[in-house]
C-alpha cells in the first residue's frame, strides 16, 4: 500500500535521504542493474533500514518495519 499525500508519494521507495539500492546517502551512485530496472529496492529511502523484499514473476513488494509496504504494481500505475 502506498500512501499519497498532496500528490506526493510517501513510501519506503519515495525520494528520501537514502539510496534504496545501497542504503547509503541518496547522492551515491546507483548500481547499473538497478538503473536498468532489474533490481528491486532493498533499503528504505526514508530511514535507510534494510527492507523485507519478495520478488515474484510479475514484480515485487518491499516492506519497511517503520514506513510500511510498497508493491511494484502500485508504482506502475503512477508512471
UniProtKB/Swiss-Prot annotation:
Phenotype when the gene is knocked out: The deletion mutant is unable to grow without extrabacterial biotin. The growth defect of the deletion mutant in biotin-free media can be complemented with biotin but not with another intermediate of the biotin synthesis pathway.
UniProt KW keywords: Biotin biosynthesis, Iron, Iron-sulfur, Metal-binding
Origin: domain of life: Bacteria
Entry's Gene Ontology molecular function annotations: iron-sulfur cluster binding; metal ion binding
Cofactor: iron-sulfur cluster
Presence of keyword Iron: yes
Protein's organism: Mycobacterium tuberculosis (strain ATCC 25618 / H37Rv)
Keyword Signal recorded: no
Function of the protein: Required for the activity of the biotin synthase BioB.
Record-given protein name: Biotin synthase auxiliary protein
Family note: Belongs to the BsaP family.
Cofactor stoichiometry and binding remark: Probably contains an unusual Fe-S cluster.
GO biological process, one term: symbiont-mediated perturbation of host innate immune response
